[in-house]
């Protein structure tokens, strides 16, 4: 059982996934700090409040914390844009690698070549 677990953990996909989750969590913290400490104050200058997360709308006993929602939307947009840029870069690199690969002959190509050689030999 322990050996199987070691083999499972040692597989590339599991390790890649773990690294991705850890980096994603760290990146999320960076984006949240960016939004809280830089973007919110800039927006707050125009809105009149520095801390957007405290923006609320009250209707009777109900309190709608739309400032926190705005923060979450900004976080989402930044993270989505960065992920988009990363995927775009990876696709560009992958496409270049595919273009650089020489075409390897297929089984059909070899059979056609053999056929052509046999035809040549028969005509001589």
Curated annotation (Swiss-Prot):
Keywords: Cell membrane, Ion channel, Ion transport, Membrane, Transmembrane, Transmembrane helix, Transport. GO terms for cellular component: plasma membrane. GO terms for molecular function: mechanosensitive monoatomic ion channel activity. The chain crosses the membrane at residues 14-34, 37-57, 67-87. It is a multi-pass membrane protein. It comes from the Bacteria. Gene3D superfamilies: Large-conductance mechanosensitive channel, MscL, domain 1 (1.10.1200.120). InterPro entries: Mechanosensitive_channel_CS (IPR019823), MS_channel (IPR001185), MSC/AndL (IPR037673), MscL_channel (IPR036019). It holds the Pfam family MscL. It is found in: Cell membrane. NCBIfam families: mscL, PRK00567.1-3. Belongs to the MscL family. Channel that opens in response to stretch forces in the membrane lipid bilayer. May participate in the regulation of osmotic pressure changes within the cell. Homopentamer. This is Large-conductance mechanosensitive channel. The lineage of its organism: Bacteria, Bacillati, Bacillota, Bacilli, Lactobacillales. The gene is mscL.
